[in-house]
Regions:
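Bacterial N-terminal signal peptides that target proteins for export
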Residues: 1-7
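Cleavable N-terminal signal peptides
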Residues: 8-9, 19
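Outer-membrane beta-barrel biogenesis signature
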Residues: 21-25, 39, 64-86
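Short glycine/proline- and aromatic-enriched beta-strand/turn motifs that initiate or cap beta-hairpins
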Residues: 21-61, 93-105
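Short acidic, Gly/Pro-enriched loop/turn segments at secondary-structure junctions
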Residues: 61-64, 134-135
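Outer-membrane pore/translocation modules
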Residues: 75-194
Length: 194
């Protein structure tokens, strides 16, 4: 599947429940960061990121396919540790991309004493739950993604050409070059204050 089809599919998947949301609190957030915005404008350790997040407490959105998968995982994990939870109060889906570069970007060879090139394209599903006692809660997050796709090389070098920065020459040596699936799950407990 091409990268454009993947992005289109994920966008439709994330945005389709929004058309059905009624009487709910919903938020769309777009975040971007780039070393270009930093005072020193250095590519050391990080170069750029972009994410779009949609969160809502609507029942339609809570029932979207990605949230359904992660809610099943939440029930399995949280019941396994004895957490008594209600249905989720809210859910969020985030689609993002991040790129990391070493300090010395002009070198074509690998420098084992510097951070490697790497990129991550991901989809994350998170939920907020209250416990049955209503005095505490849980926040969970399931992230699936792909490391090492060729998504930053041309973009970074195009921006660098416009702003007069050095060309990044080591993207062919990035971590998991060509693509490797990745997965992350987290569950955080919260005790509410009176």
């Amino acid at each position: 599947m091409s990268h454009r089809l993947l992005v289109l599919f994920l966008t439709v998947l994330v945005l389709s429940p929004m058309a059905h949301a009624e009487n709910s609190d919903s938020v769309i957030a777009l975040s971007t960061d780039n070393d270009l915005f930093a005072p020193t404008q250095t590519d050391r350790d990080y170069t750029a990121g972009l994410a779009i997040t949609y969160s809502s407490n609507s029942e339609d959105f809570l029932g979207n396919p990605v949230s359904g998968i992660s809610q099943n995982l939440d029930r399995f994990v949280l019941s396994g540790i004895g957490a008594d939870i209600n249905e989720p109060e809210s859910a969020a889906l985030e689609f993002g991309i991040y790129g990391f570069t070493p300090e010395e970007i002009k070198a074509r060879d690998i420098d084992r004493d510097d951070r490697p090139y790497s990129s991550l394209v991901y989809l994350s599903s998170s939920h907020s739950y209250r416990t049955l006692s209503d005095d505490s809660g849980w926040t969970t997050s399931m992230t699936v993604g792909v490391l090492g796709l060729d998504v930053f090389k041309s973009g970074q070098n195009a921006v660098h050409k416009v702003v007069g920065s050095d060309r990044a020459n080591g993207w062919d040596h990035q971590v998991s070059n060509g693509g490797e699936p990745t997965f992350r799950y987290s569950a955080a407990y919260h005790q509410y204050l009176d």
